[in-house]
Every structure is written in structure tokens, then in C-alpha cells.
């Protein structure tokens, strides 16, 4: 195994123009496998089921990922004891973060991958806690990342650039490279700050890599990063670009992204992007100048492999996972059925409009679009579980807003 520090670092790779491939969506993948609870989406599985987390890391590594992101999404102390999710009573936030770092490092050392320690938005910010309090939460995670000597840091999944800036400022205290991504679309963050301005603020706070992750489909994320790039150029601020989108089609989303869709989170399967969609995304991102290209919720290892295969000419090699995957379906030449063998060609898959097989379902949905954000009563943090009356009130609101 390669010793820690022997590999080229993140900025060394990006400065040289190399493509860095991120991994995929751990919370969604592990929820489907039975290791994460939908709702809180917290990562205690790192402690409770380390073998499941380790295996998913390995699958992304085999698919071509250069980064093993620690499974520390929503691993802040306040999130681990929020709305009846009493994880912190059994497993400390420190323990979750430590074990997640160890697993990521173990797998990263099996290949040419870096370890990224990640923090994300907090219930405390949404509850209007002070900058000092919110930064204190990030700093607890950072202490673990420094102790475990991660290679770089990611502030990801922020709906408000203000909180993301606070996270970047804390992570910069480590002296390690920092990447920062917002879960926003072309309309900007939930306070109306444009993507271009968001990118400038993140870069000025100390992020060497800026971009978007989650909430929107691949091509929407590319469009958003294009606006970020334009903002950076106009402000004469330099930063590398990064995209880690959903693996779901979201043309009907509002400002909040896929969380507003009525199918979220248990009926999103008809929206899953194909591996061929990901080829198009990877090429579009690369052509825009993005060099850190990965995925988020819904991204499985075969999606990551599609990025690696599309950009194999630029990278100079294919991932190990391609040993069992013929380029553009060429492996179908071995199929028993002749009509399937006839599909062993690129133009077939590029031109195919996949059917959903659901004749009585709409192709688009109407987003809920409640419009609540930081400071709203329904977003205030509470340790106690949602009460029956609170749930009744929400259902009543839902009925009013739907009408």
C-alpha cells in the first residue's frame, strides 16, 4: 500500500490539469442497502456497519474514483441528536468521524486515491445560532480530520453561502487544501446570492476549489458552475471548479432542488440517470474547464465508472471496473439473443430515449416549494422527536399549499 503523503496532492493534480474523479452518494446508496435511516440521513453506519461503508468505498475506488470522501455527511454533534435521532446518546460524533476517517484511509491506500474530510450544513445554522457556535461545531470535526491527517477538506452541501464561508474559514485553519460546494442551482442560494457571487465569496474565504453538489441533475449543475466560473473571471479571482451532482433528472425542480419534489426520497427511481447520461455530463463538465468531477445522491459506482471511461483519453487509462464493462455496450456482442447483440454499439445507446414503463405516470411533477429557510419555525432545531401535533400541523400546511 502507498504510504500516506507519497501520492500527489489535490492541488498538485489540479494545477497540472489532471482530472480528479470524486466518489458517489453514500447516504442514498447505504439507505437502499439497509444501513442508513432516511430522514436524519446520519452516518453512524461507519461505526455500526464498517464493512458496508468499506465495501462501498472499494466499489467507488474500483470504478475510478481518486477521492475517498470520509462518510461524515451530517456527522456534526447537533445533527446526531436532532428531532428524535438520538445517535449521540450511543455513539459520539467524535467516534463517527474517527472511524469514517480510518475506513476511508484504509481503502484509499489500496489505490491512487486521496482522503477528503467533509463537513456539511448544520441544524444550528438553520436555527439562527451564532457564527461562533456554528464554527465551533465545524471545528470539532476538523480536530478529528487533523488528527487523522486527511489529505484535504471539503465543505459540501450548503444551501446558504454564508454558512459555507464560515465552514471554509474554519477548515482553512488546518493549512490543508479546502474545496467547497453549494447545493444550489442557477438561481443561487436560498438568500438569493447568485452562483457567481457565491463562488467569489467561497474563494476569497480560502477555498481553492469551488462548485456545486447534490440537489440538481448533472447538466443543471454544469450550468450552475458555468455561472460560477463567469463570476470568478469577472472578479479576477482564481479557483479550480468542481461538480458532484445528483444521479436523478430534475428539470421540474424549484430553487430547493429535488427535496421539493413529491417523489423525494422514496420514489425517485424513475428519474435515475443512465450511464450514458453520465458520459455526456462528464464531457460537458470537462469542456467547461471542470477538473474535479464526481457525484452525489443517487450516484452508484457504475455512474462513477462512466465518468472514468468518458475521460479515459484525457487520463490515459481505464479504471479496474472497466475490465467487466465493454465500451459503449460492446460486451453485448457475447449475448445469446441476436437483437441484443445488435445493441452493441455507441449510436444505439446515445440515441435511445429510455421509457419509464409507467404509462399512467406524468413525466414531470409539481414541486412543493414551501419556501422556508433559515429562521423559519419549522426548521428550528429540537432534540425531541417530532410530535403528533407537529406532524398534523405540517400535513395541514401541505394540504393548504397544494391547493
UniProtKB/Swiss-Prot annotation:
Gene3D superfamilies: Homocysteine-binding-like domain. GO terms for biological process: amino-acid betaine catabolic process; L-methionine salvage; methylation. Keywords: Cytoplasm, Metal-binding, Methyltransferase, Transferase, Zinc. The keyword Ligase does not apply. It is an enzyme of class 2 (transferase). It is found in: Cytoplasm. InterPro entries: Betaine-hCys_S-MeTrfase_BHMT (IPR017226), BHMT (IPR051524), HCY_dom (IPR003726), HCY_dom_sf (IPR036589). Binds 1 zinc ion per subunit. It catalyses: L-homocysteine + glycine betaine = N,N-dimethylglycine + L-methionine. Pfam families: S-methyl_trans. Residues 8-311 form the Hcy-binding domain. Zn(2+) binds at residues 214, 296-297. This is Betaine--homocysteine S-methyltransferase 1. It comes from Xenopus laevis (African clawed frog).
